[in-house]
C-alpha cells in the first residue's frame, strides 16, 4: 500500500486493490465497500446488517471520503464483495488501517467524529 498521510490517502489507496467482480456488474467501487466496512467497524458494527445500518445513519460522514454515487450498499452486497476479496489483502488492509489509527493518536477518528 502507498504511504498513508491522512484518511483521504488511506481510502484512496484502496482503489489499487484488484476487484474480482465482473466490471459491468460493479455498482459499488471496491474501495468504498472496504472503506465503509472499516469505518463501520470503528462504530462497533460487527455484522453485515449492522454495517449497512451504520453506513446509512452516517451517510453524510461517509460522503466526505467516498462518492457514494449509488448510495449505501445492502448488507448482502457488503458480505458478497468482502467475501470475494483475497483474505490476505483484507488482513494487510486491516493492519495498515490499525497502524494508521495508532500512529496518529486516533486523529482520523477525531476527524470523523467532527463530521
Residue spans for each PLM region:
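Dynamic "connector" segments at or just before major functional cores
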Residues: 1-114
